[in-house]
Amino acid sequence: MTELIKKGSAAKEASQFLAQASTKQKNAALLNLSNDLLAHTASLLQENNKDIIRAREKGTPETMIDRLRLTEERIKEISDAVKQVVALKDPIGEVTNMWKNEAELTIGKTRVPLGVIGIIYESRPNVTVDASVLCFKTGNAVILRGGSDAIDSNKALMSVIQDSLAASGFPRSSVQLIEDTSRETARDMMRLNRFLDVLIPRGGAKLIQTVLENATVPVIETGTGNCHIYVDKAAEKQMAIDILVNAKCSRPSVCNAAETLLIHRDVAEAFLPEMETALKEYNVELRADERAREILKDSKAATESDWEDEFLDFILAIKVVDSVDEAINHINKYGTKHSEAIISNDYATGQAFHQKVDAAAVYINASTRFTDGFAMGFGAEIGISTQKLHARGPMGLTELTSTKYIIFGDGQIRN
């Protein structure tokens, strides 16, 4: 708890400095950080390798090790992502509305930082930089708590970040890492209302549920991604296959990858064998319901848990449905309100799907893999919010701000 109190207090103080920093000052610091990350590539890879070795010794699946791994190319991508944040419009100070009331008061509504943001996440060291940079750009101090499996990578990245920001004249406590990765410290952080204004969990279902059950700090939930592809009877077959292969196989370990295929009964017999052939190239394990298994003889029988799981692996659950409404009901029962897709050339069916499916992002004839700040065209994001209050979907710079009313008068008093 001592580490949390010390760093929480320092973050609170730093947040006051950051709130007054100009866009020019922040961007200059971020450009320096981008260069410093590249300059420290060798040492970052050395520390990351310690995490990789430890993960392999523990028998961690390769798909999960991929989330942990840094390479020269990935560090270059992280560095480039910092520059992309520099190019984004700074929302701080933006006046979103202004008007005069009956008392002739001029009332303005402007964007301000949230204050101090806490982020609890798992085994993706790039999040250490992404989260730091987004919070910094929006004038927020941030306290990060990563997983134990990435601790050496995170400590090395934090050292580069803090040294770089300090060299640009910013407090080192603008961005901090909790190095104690125990569950007890994580739970203490969830109750750090004295210093944290908001807590954002990034990770699997277990982590997010733990945060929701234990946190007293306000939480923005970035949900798990049990995403579905529904292939309608009016779907173009090759388009559907291409989208499914992309959504499942391009990067199965991320939250916007597809986990379940729902297929209309009228096209199942024609579609499923060709789909199976396309997925064999990636050694995808198929877990199918009874009707789908009549067509896919080599598939495994799907269990109830298969409809609920975020596999994050080359595994696909498959269910044959009688109608779009059955597909919608299945998604709303088992989905995580993240990203859902329908493949159909029938306009009315597509409209019904997007109106009835409860998700942050609903796709018509496109892959779920586009649920990402950069892919959607508004820049880096801190995570994908699956809740409805404050933010929903990819959380960019604007979602890391609050608003403040500024009222100008010339002596008015209220009668």
From Swiss-Prot:
Its main location: cytoplasm. GO terms for cellular component: cytoplasm. Pfam families: Aldedh (PF00171). One of its GO terms (molecular function) is glutamate-5-semialdehyde dehydrogenase activity. It catalyses: L-glutamate 5-semialdehyde + phosphate + NADP(+) = L-glutamyl 5-phosphate + NADPH + H(+). It is found in: Cytoplasm. Belongs to the gamma-glutamyl phosphate reductase family. Catalyzes the NADPH-dependent reduction of L-glutamate 5-phosphate into L-glutamate 5-semialdehyde and phosphate. The product spontaneously undergoes cyclization to form 1-pyrroline-5-carboxylate. This is Gamma-glutamyl phosphate reductase. It comes from Listeria innocua serovar 6a (strain ATCC BAA-680 / CLIP 11262). The lineage of its organism: Bacteria, Bacillati, Bacillota, Bacilli, Bacillales.
